[in-house]
Design a protein with these regions (language model features):
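Bacterial N-terminal signal peptides that target proteins for export
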Residues: 1-9
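A residue-level marker of the well-folded mature domains of exported/periplasmic proteins
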Residues: 22-379
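Bacterial N-terminal signal peptides
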Residues: 9-18
Length: 379
């Protein structure tokens, strides 16, 4: 996978996006049409513009940075001037919710592209609806999480994290924090999503033989269930010593329960993503390591590729995907950060050098400064 240059590409002008992270979940960028309420279908444009839609898997603060990336791409590429809009649509009803939204897209004549973070990598109905859209001439891509290999011929590209590597980075962090090993449970929303499977498998692989997995608990993106899963895991496993959050909201769910039980000293806590509350929780000493993705880059690059394809811009496509025709060449890696507390952490940059330049080690204060510079509250 190729590391995206976008962390540098969006340095200029991102300061104007302070409000972008607060957009409604399907706010259309580059158009005067009215946006629908969060979690509903985007309103078809009445201006004759073609729409580029990014459909997420569930609503979360994680997507705010992706919306900022979409907005910046719309501005840089002058979408409105050239007859296009770009927006994110939020799915709030699991696999069935995505299937229904894809069916509705098929009835709308103004859609140029659909880029999806599929709730299930292996759901044939999702793949079938994407295929139906593709047959109508709509460009299909994935971001954040990919389809299973057997369905990948349906989509042209994937933009996002190398999720196996992300899991390995988190596993390496756990190993560095607790070198003698221990028992762990991994917490996630949907166990069938490719990013979930790859992250959990990657964690297990990198953590090594001294660590023993005691479970993989799913919550269907219900925050109450997420906390219940943590409580049950702690109550049922007296030797448990590592709690692993795989999706963004799992971090605060873990911290809530550990605080509730007054058991911080018993657990190493390692998590994915950096919701604003999780950043504050690390500041309070409640999280030991975070693997942070680049959702801004996911949003920006997805729009950039689609617009280049629509315009016949072969040079940009070749720059973004130089090996597009090769196996795996239609995947664009947007990179990772591993974030550690400022004080008292045994983690060092050298522990993560094996993962190459696409993985950047930052102390929490450095990460906060990076967010502040670009007017982001999380990533």
């Amino acid at each position: 996978m190729r590391f995206s240059p976008l962390p540098f590409a969006f340095l200029v002008g991102l300061s104007i996006l302070g409000l972008s992270g607060c957009r409604e979940s399907n706010d259309s960028v580059g158009t005067g049409s009215q946006a629908a309420p969060a979690g509903t279908d985007p309103v078809p444009t009445t201006t004759g513009k073609k729409r580029i839609i990014l459909l997420n898997n569930t609503e979360s603060p994680f997507w705010d940075a992706a919306r900022a990336g979409i907005a910046k791409a719309a501005e840089d590429l002058k979408l409105e001037e050239n007859g296009f809009t770009a927006s994110m649509d939020s799915n709030t009803n699991g696999e069935e919710g995505q299937i229904e939204k894809l069916r509705q897209y098929g009835t709308q004549s103004d859609i140029a592209a659909v880029i999806i973070s599929p709730t299930s990598a292996t759901n044939a109905a999702i793949a079938d609806e994407l295929k139906n859209l593709k047959e109508k001439g709509i460009i299909i891509g994935t971001f954040d999480s990919d389809l299973d290999t057997k369905f990948q011929e349906t989509r042209e590209f994937y933009v996002g994290t190398n999720n196996t590597r992300g899991g390995e980075v988190l596993g390496a962090a756990a190993k560095g924090l607790q070198p003698d090993g221990g028992e762990y449970v991994q917490f996630v929303g949907y166990g069938s999503m490719q990013n979930a499977v790859q992250r959990m498998d990657g964690f297990t692989s990198a953590a090594g033989d001294k660590f023993t997995q005691k479970g993989r608990r799913t919550d269907d993106t219900d925050p109450n269930r997420a906390r219940d899963n943590v409580r049950d895991s702690i109550d049922q496993n007296s030797s448990l010593s590592v709690l692993v959050g795989i999706w963004s909201y799992n971090a605060p769910a873990i911290v809530d329960v550990v605080k509730e039980k007054n058991m911080r000293d018993k657990f190493t806590i390692v998590t994915f993503d950096a919701e604003p509350i999780a950043i504050e929780q690390m500041s309070e000493g409640m999280i030991d390591a975070m693997v942070v993705q680049n959702p801004f880059g996911m949003g920006y690059d997805s729009v950039r590729y689609v617009y280049s394809k629509l315009r016949g811009d072969a040079a940009t496509i070749a720059e973004m995907f130089p090996n597009m025709k090769d196996s795996g060449g239609n995947i664009r890696d947007t990179g990772l950060k591993i974030v550690a507390p400022d004080e008292g952490s045994p983690l060092t940059p050298e522990m993560f050098k094996e993962f190459g330049p696409s993985v950047q080690f930052l102390k929490l204060s450095e990460f906060k400064a990076w967010l502040k510079e670009y007017n982001l509250t999380g990533s």
